Amino acid sequence: MTSDTEGSRAFYCQVFGWTAEEPAGEFGGYVNFTKEGIRMTGCMASQPGSGVPDVWSVYLATEDAEKTLAAAATHAGQVHVQAMAVGDLGTMAFVTDPGGAGIGLWQPGRHQGFGVLGEPGAPSWFELHTRDYEAAVGFYRTVFGWDT
């Protein structure tokens, strides 16, 4: 989410060599970035005056967004965006973990997720900084089945 869509488009295209697609009207002006024709990430404008800072969001894959939302809510997470279809691309939702970190959920449709890995400009690592380590570890183990 950004307060300067045009500036963000120019920045990421120049720094990472991405190409910005034209904003998709049916998705509220959402901009997809591609690398060599493969979708990498997206960008949307924040609401003016919302006080929300510019921020990146990470989406974790799930086979069933509704089931994962229920598990998150049961294990001290908060649901902020209920599962919703994003055209035929997939289904998204958004939660915060017990420490307050935001995390998106992505149930793939036509868009499976990252198509480019291990190259400059491609995602390579995500790291959680949390106020409540034990609660966060328990949440991700239980909700997503992760080992730590």
Which residues make up each language-model segment?
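DNA polymerase sliding clamps and clamp-related checkpoint/processivity subunits
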Residues: 42-49, 58, 80-81, 85, ...
